[in-house]
Amino acid sequence: MKPSSRLRKSALWIAAALSLGAINSGHAAEGPIAAPVELSPAVLPGKGLAQHPFLYAGEWDHRYPDQTMFVVRDGKVAWTYSIKLKDDAGQIQEFSDATLLSNGNIVFARKTGAALVSPEKKILWNYDAPPGFEVHVAQPIGLNRVMLVQNGNPAKMMMVNIATGKTETEFKLPVGNPAGTHGQFRRARMTLAGTLLAAHMDNNKVAEYDMSGNEVWALAVLSPWAAVRLKNGNTLVTSNRGFVKEFSPKGDVVWEFSQQDVPSIKLFNFQEANRLANGNTVISCWCPGALKDPKDWPNSVQVIEVTPQKKLVWALRSWDADANLGPATCIQLLDEPGKPEDGDQQR
């Protein structure tokens, strides 16, 4: 259906923000801040690495020649897997999406493609994006399929059977800038209703599509990084402008969180958000776009957990040698109920 009048009205304030130069299609969604700034207090709420077991990965840790994802259990790094910062063709690789499945394998997107890796670090399935295209979305659909969104001209959604290697469903996705491959999508998710919910970062909207590629619902949001359809029917959206908002099906904001709700900690780009079974929200905060000097990164908080009342109950800052997690993009809590490949977790 066509965008509602609410969508058109919301677009007006987005246009105003654009006129002030608020949008940038690349990683650097915020200007550099003076450093070193007091980014977070010495003592943070929660139990640090021991708060939850979790899978963690981040984009563009350009301090090192390898990019690493981590599994943390009992407050310690239990497993890692690394890829090169640059592939054999010299293209930058980064972890944009990652999910630990119930069988122990991990599906991940790496910008230059996507793959499935076993706990023994054996690649069980791999997809390489064609030159000029990028893959930042890899969602497991059961244990035998992966939904990919491929940035480029054209951008498209693909449902791939990893057992056969065949693409079973695909359709093109509209974008704001066909030539701006890198700034098009970071996150999209299949819903339990069988539709695709896509955060159009360069189109300033979240849109839902049926499997024929028809838009069935849309919402104007400034530079959305991720969008998740919650079990209550609402949609949880993060923006790399530093806010998280929960919208009703009618487009009303029913809950929101931003920097002003936690003034004691400097927050940067909001990327992934998880709505937990207890109602709390976990948010990853990616810092390299604002903190240009990596020496300043260890002062920053990577992940926060807040209650529905916006109380901060966990702030993760882990840059020490034995658990140098790097910038935060993906976090999957491993103590949440259900099977992630069945859509049981809200992330």
Which residues make up each language-model segment?
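N-terminal secretory signal peptides that target proteins for export/translocation
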Residues: 1-7
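Bacterial N-terminal signal peptides
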Residues: 11-22
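Sec/Tat signal peptide C-region and signal peptidase I cleavage site
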Residues: 24-27
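Histidine-/acidic-rich catalytic cores in large beta-rich domains
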Residues: 29-347
